[in-house]
Amino acid sequence: DIWKLGRHRVICGDSTLPETFNSLMGDVKANLVCTDAPYFVNLENASGKIANDNLGDREAYEFLMKVFTNLKEHMAIDSSFYEFYATMKSRVFYDAFEDAGFKVGATLIWKKPKAPFMRTDWKFNMEPIIFGWRKDGKHNWYGDQKQTAVFEFDGIKDSEKEGFGHPSSKPVPLIAYLISQCT
């Protein structure tokens, strides 16, 4: 299914398949990608297991390579890319990001007001984001020179209880902030 939202389009499909992107994008190239791939940490959401979140490192790398390669084919030469990820899988994400043809420009940190409940020694009140662009291109930057790599936005309170069903829902102001820096 493809939904049109003004000039934008959203598809529900398999990001590892080129035909998903071909159906969504046609000949149009994206100016920005902001994605939240599975974190590969075996989490559950309100409706059960998150698809592909239980993959091992090798399978996770192969999954990301397919997705990132498909994304690159449909991104403008001067586009930017934001990828949210889990710190415990940093190497998998960075390796796939770079091997698929992207340059890492920065690691950004979204500082959350509180840590979600997790059965870990350290509670993560932050979420890392890879910021980058195509190695064969450049990127646009519209932010000033005062932007820091750590920023704080309120999370979505009780997102799972309110029916969002995602253990780490992203607040709209956070996404709007990221978009405004590059488009």
Describe each model-derived feature in a short phrase.
Residues D1-T183:
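Core catalytic lobe of class I
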